[in-house]
Amino acid sequence: MVNMKASMFLTFAGLVLLFVVCYASESEEKEFPKEMLSSIFAVDNDFKQGERDCAGYMRECKEKLCCSGYVCSSRWKWCVLPAPWRR
């Protein structure tokens, strides 16, 4: 009974180790963290670079009007999605 528990534990530990090694080598190849950060900032830059006279989702709407499809929250003064319970 002890041998079976030990062998199951070693098998599980080996699979976890294999997963970690494969993930690490794949991450190095793809440079996952850099790609993720650059994609996040690229989306943010699109909003900054584009000439807009409206505010997008979760942007302040005190001075700007919200873009189409959004409404200005009277409580928080952010552009949010319209919902039946919001007025």
Curated annotation (Swiss-Prot):
Its main location: secreted. Keywords: Disulfide bond, Ion channel impairing toxin, Knottin, Secreted, Signal, Toxin. GO terms for cellular component: extracellular region. It comes from the Eukaryota. Disulfide bonds join C54-C67, C61-C72, C66-C79. One of its GO terms (molecular function) is ion channel inhibitor activity. It is found in: Secreted. The presence of a 'disulfide through disulfide knot' structurally defines this protein as a knottin. The keyword Zinc does not apply. InterPro entries: Huwentoxin-1 (IPR011696), Huwentoxin_CS1 (IPR013140). This is U3-theraphotoxin-Hhn1a 16. The keyword Secreted applies. It comes from Cyriopagopus hainanus. Residues 1-24 form the signal peptide. Residues 25-52 form a propeptide. It holds the Pfam family Toxin_12. Expressed by the venom gland. Belongs to the neurotoxin 10 (Hwtx-1) family. 51 (Hntx-8) subfamily. Hntx-8 sub-subfamily. Ion channel inhibitor.
